[in-house]
Amino acid sequence: MIVLSFCGLGFAQNVIEPELQNALNQKGDEMISVNIILKSQMDSEKLRACAEKTTDKHVRRNIMIDELKLFSEKEQQEIMSILHAEAKSNRVADIKGHWMANYINCTTTRDVIYLLAQHPDVMMIGYNQEKYLLWDEKAEPVEMSRDIVIENVTMVNADDVWAMGYTGDGVLVAVIDTGVNYNHVDVADHLWDGGPQFPHHGYNIIDNTNDPMDVLGHGTHCAGTICGDGTSGIITGMAPDATLMCIRVLDDYGYGYASDFNTGMEFAVEHQADIISMSLGLMSASVSDKTLLRNACVNTLQLGVVAAVAVGNDGQMAMVPVPNNVRVPGSCPPPWLHPDQEVNPGALSCVVAVGAIDYYENMYENGSKGPVTWTDTPFNDYPYNPNIGLIRPDICAPGVGIKSLDHDNNDGYNLKTGTSMATPCVAGVMAL
C-alpha cells in the first residue's frame, strides 16, 4: 500500500505540473500517461570529451550515444525499480526509459504519481497528453506540365548548386512527421536501407511497427520538397539525391505525443541521420514538454545533427500571443547565435526555426512570430521584453503554394501552403 504524509503530498504538488494535477482530479483512479523528468542531465562538455580522440563522425556519435545511454540507465535505476515493483500490482504499465533527454514515460495511477513526486531524483512529472500537432494545410490538386523544376527550387537557387556537383548524395535526412508514401516513384530509389529489421525505410513510432506509411499526406509532401527527384516529371526536391529516412510520429488525423517526438529523434540520431526535418509542433506546450524536448534538442546537437523545424501557422491566433506564439520544438534555440542575439544570449540546441514567405518574398501572414522566452522553464534563459527574447524564426523559405508529392498517387503531385512546406526546403538546402 502507498502511504503519503501531508507534508509529502505538499511537496509532490510542487513537482506535479498543473496540467497533470487537473487531469488527476478529473480521472480519479484511472491510469494516465506521464513523463517523469529527472533532475540530472548529461553534462555537454563531458559528453563531447568522451569522444574527442576520434575524428570519424559515426564512431564519435556512437560513443556519445553509448555514454548517454549509460548515464540515463544509471540515473533512472531507482525510479525504474519503483515502477517495475508497482507494475506487478498493475499500477504501472508501458514503461519506457529515454536516453536522449533522461526521462521515463509510463502509464500509471494517481497514487504512484504522488509517490514518485516525492523522490529526490525527480524534477517534474508532466501529463503526456495526446494533442493535434499539425495545422490545417489543405492539399489542392495541381495540373502542370512535366519535365520541369518547380519554383521554390529555383527561387533558392538549388539548381545552381546541382550544376556545381552537389545534389545531396550521401546525406541522410530523417522526416519526422505523419510518415511517408515510400512507394512514390520520386523518392522510391533513394530511401534509407534499414535492412531486414526496418524494411520500409524507417519506423512508425505511434503504432510501434516498422511501417511508416503515410495515410494523411503531410509527411509525403514534406519529403518531396527535400528530395523528390522528378522521376515522374517534376523535380520538387532541393537535394534530389539525398537519402530519405521515414519516421511516423503522428496518427491518421495528425495527433501525437511529445514523448513520441523524442522517440523519433532518438531513432533518427541512433541510425545515423545527418539532418532532421520536423514540420509539426506543440501549441501552448507545458513546461515538462518544453523541458524534455529542449533537452533532446540539446543532445541532438551534441551528436552532430541539426534540425529544420517549423515555427507554426498560429500568427493570427490571439489566444497564443508573443512570446508563446511559436510552437515547440520550433521555439528551441538554434545551433548558432546570430549577432543580433548577443544582447540576450542563452544556450544552444539543434533547432533551425523556419518561417515561410511567398514567391514575392512577402512573409506568410499566418506564420507564427517570435520572439520567445525560456524563463518559465528550468533553463531560465532568453528573458522576454518587447523585441528581445529569443529571435524566431531563424530563417524563412518559400512556403506558399508549394507543389510536392501526393501520398495517394505514386506518381502524382499536389499543392500546399504553410511553414510546414518551408521547413523541408531548409532541410533540403542543408543537405546540399
Provide a role label for each language-model segment.
Residues 1-15:
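Bacterial Sec-dependent N-terminal signal peptides
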Residues 13, 24, 28-29, 160-201, ...:
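Subtilisin-like serine protease catalytic core
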Residues 13-137:
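Inhibitory N-terminal propeptides of secreted protease zymogens
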Residues 36-41, 108-109, 127-130, 174-179, ...:
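Active-site-proximal beta-strand/loop segments in catalytic clefts of secreted hydrolases
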Residues 115-172, 185-186, 361-365, 370:
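Protease zymogen maturation seam
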Residues 197, 327-431:
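Extracellular S/T/G-rich loop segment that most often corresponds to the catalytic His/Ser-adjacent loop
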Residues 265-288, 310-311:
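Short acidic, glycine-rich surface-loop motifs adjacent to enzyme active sites
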Residues 289-304:
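Catalytic-core regions built around general acid/base machinery
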